């Protein structure tokens, strides 16, 4: 499974666009994965990179990478990132995404991915945003398949929060 960071020409989406004008926008996509994985990673992980870290304007991705490394080194137990798109609960093993506006609901259930996948995606997004905005710019990173089994609906950090979220499971 891989993530592709690139730019696309969106000029054709504008009615007043002339044939020689070029309007580009970044695009993130999951490739070499099943439809279910593409959908879930796209809906949560890639959406969070797009909505919460647009262009790394204030070095937000650099700051986040330092927090992730602090969690990995056990300098801090976990880190909660409150942002516009998602609240992200970062622990040593996984990152849980909760929609910042809708919370936990049928359209936006909690979702988690391995910390390794999250860190790779965040580092790649930072590197991508540092590159020139061009249709030739592309970054592709591979997410380790061996970590897929760690994806869980209720990782340890969520069990602690389950009562406050009024979640029920068997």
Regions inferred by a protein language model and the residue ranges of each:
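Acidic (Asp/Glu-rich) sequence patches and key acidic residues
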Residues: 9-13, 18-106
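Acidic, proline/glycine-rich low-complexity IDRs
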Residues: 98-170
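Long protein-protein interaction modules used by eukaryotic assembly/scaffold proteins
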Residues: 5-6
